């Protein structure tokens, strides 16, 4: 019922960025991830702040949380992780395959990941660069993810410009092999064009051919959502783009007429229980106040239901979840009420929102009326 509030660290004043009339941002908490970092049986909280600011983790004191929070909060002990996290879509997952999650990010001139010392997790975390050849990476660069692209059983590193292949050995300082591919458009005269990209990026077998494809939004402050079909020719890996939502304000690609901007966060989860992972995303609420394209349109949340067809093709069918909340820099799906159905959590400048999934029995006519309608000409 979400009636009880627990404050695990004191409020921090927001940071004003740029010249926007309300361009304020959470300096200390752009992203939050939950994991038992010190292995004491209690989940802790890892926070990542505004790009190029530190990350910390907060140690769960291991007390009961069944009643209302205390009037005088007992704040959790804060532990330093790293002094600066670059990229606007850092992610927390087990890229190394050791059973423990790492924080994927950029630092200085390198993409890589940080992980705690397993013997002393309260010490600063260790940064593991996956390459030594980049120029300085701008902290506002968008788009990052991981997954097994080449099918060798090891997770690879995905960015807007391509993917980096994990080697068989994770010897410290060893370069991962980089494969360039323009998943997002970073060309143009705009001063920020080189930073373009979406949010979370995924490797997932969309069309069921046994090869993992790439799923990404294309511009976190503009338009576009695509999946890139992996194509093999001999030993070469390349991709074929399939547009889910158009790359400009006018819809020219979505057969159901769905078009919205500012997809700054994307989640991948099986919403309907058919065994296929669907896309959950939405329009960011006032990402740059009202300066972004489409900023004054409804702050919607959608899930795109994946359907695989007998001819080997695939389609994402859009279903609206909400048209008033919007999303923020992070979007999380999970079963909050233990009913076996995934729910959705979103937080932004508009508030914090929980969307609990509910199912009911209907007749055939009502079911048909609820289905998205294809536009003529598609």
Where do the model's predicted regions map?
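Beta-propeller-forming repeat regions
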Residues: 1-378
């Amino acid at each position: 019922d979400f009636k009880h509030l627990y404050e695990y660290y004191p409020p921090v004043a927001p940071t004003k960025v740029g010249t926007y009339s309300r361009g304020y941002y959470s300096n200390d908490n752009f992203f939050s991830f939950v994991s038992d970092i010190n292995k004491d049986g209690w989940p802790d909280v890892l926070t990542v702040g505004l790009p190029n600011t530190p990350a910390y983790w907060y140690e769960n004191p291991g007390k009961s949380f069944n009643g209302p929070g205390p009037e005088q909060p007992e704040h959790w002990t804060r532990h330093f992780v790293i002094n600066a996290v670059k990229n606007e879509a850092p992610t927390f997952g087990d890229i190394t395959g050791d059973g423990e999650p790492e924080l994927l990010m950029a630092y200085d001139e390198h993409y890589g990941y940080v992980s705690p010392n397993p013997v002393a997790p309260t010490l600063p975390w260790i940064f593991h660069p996956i390459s030594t050849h980049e120029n300085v990476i701008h902290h506002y660069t968008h788009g990052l993810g991981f997954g097994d692209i080449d099918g060798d059983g090891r997770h690879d590193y995905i960015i807007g410009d391509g993917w980096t292949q994990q080697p068989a050995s994770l010897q410290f300082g060893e370069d991962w092999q980089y494969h360039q591919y323009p998943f997002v458009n970073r060309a143009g005269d705009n001063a920020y064009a080189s930073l373009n990209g979406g949010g979370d990026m995924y490797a997932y077998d969309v069309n069921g051919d046994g090869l993992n494809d790439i799923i990404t939004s294309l511009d976190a402050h503009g338009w576009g959502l695509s999946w890139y079909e992996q194509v093999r020719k001999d030993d070469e890996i390349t991709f074929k783009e399939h547009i889910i939502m158009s790359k400009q304000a006018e819809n020219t690609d979505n057969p159901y007429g769905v078009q919205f901007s500012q997809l700054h966060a994307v989640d991948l989860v099986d919403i309907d229980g058919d065994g296929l992972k669907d896309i959950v995303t939405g329009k960011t609420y006032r990402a740059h106040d009202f300066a972004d394209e489409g900023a004054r349109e409804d702050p919607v949340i959608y899930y795109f239901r994946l359907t695989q067809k007998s001819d080997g093709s695939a389609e994402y069918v859009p279903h609206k979840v909400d048209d008033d909340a919007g999303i923020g820099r992070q979007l999380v799906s999970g079963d909050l009420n233990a009913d076996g159905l995934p729910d959705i959590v979103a937080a932004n400048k508009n508030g914090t929102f929980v969307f609990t999934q509910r199912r009911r029995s209907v007749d055939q006519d009502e079911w048909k009326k609820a289905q998205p309608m294809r536009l003529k000409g598609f």
